[in-house]
UniProtKB/Swiss-Prot annotation:
Homohexamer. One of its GO terms (molecular function) is ATP binding. Keywords: Allosteric enzyme, ATP-binding, Cytoplasm, Kinase, Nucleotide-binding, Pyrimidine biosynthesis, Transferase. Residues 20-25 are annotated as: Involved in allosteric activation by GTP. InterPro entries: AceGlu_kinase-like_sf, Asp/Glu/Uridylate_kinase, Uridylate_kinase, Uridylate_kinase_bac. GO terms for biological process: 'de novo' CTP biosynthetic process; UDP biosynthetic process. UMP binds at residues 54, 74, 135-142. It is found in: Cytoplasm. This is Uridylate kinase.
Amino acid sequence: MSNPIYKRILLKLSGEALQGDEGFGIDPSILDRMALEIKELIEMGVEVGVVLGGGNLFRGAKLAKAGMNRVVGDHMGMLATVMNGLAMRDALHRADVNAKLMSAFQLNGICDTYNWSEAIKMLREKRVVIFSAGTGSPFFTTDSAACLRGIEIEADIVLKATKVDGVYDKDPAKFADAKLYNQLTYAEVIEQELQVMDLAAFTLARDHGMPIRVFNMVKPGALKQVITGTAEGTIIS
């Protein structure tokens, strides 16, 4: 088994990644596969923090355009990430992986409230820590939450799991000649307006020197390849 090149990671999983081909909700087979891939990392000695999106269940920004108050919509979106977190924790427990679910705001009886020192303690004990409810504030995306939590727990890298192989110069779904980048600087991403994350999340990572790797989680085994240093996806640093 190859040695991991990272000691502690923050894995960002989009809600869409959990829905598979369903178009909505959670595909149990995808969830179980992701849990087993995370288990492999734990067995390699890697400390894993996870941030989940909620777009498979609810999109606050979309309803805000239809007239709903943005703050209300974002609160609903945060609760969607908690639902995804509960599903992920359950999948990890079924895979015999110790996991702790934390929420950015209080949800007594459902999960723990986010506590930095407790999260660090859990990570050191090789428990997967799932950070839900985004940053706890409206107007911030779950990508911002991923970068924030990654910086807070002093992760070596933020791994953004997507449905494409990395960062392209244009949309690969629309353009057959789209070029995949292996490596980029923060400045290149901003100059070329490449779609990696929203600007608030991305500049937070840049200002704190947090590297980001965008890779395709749909490919089985891709997560392990990233961890062992195989050229997978796009690294931004």
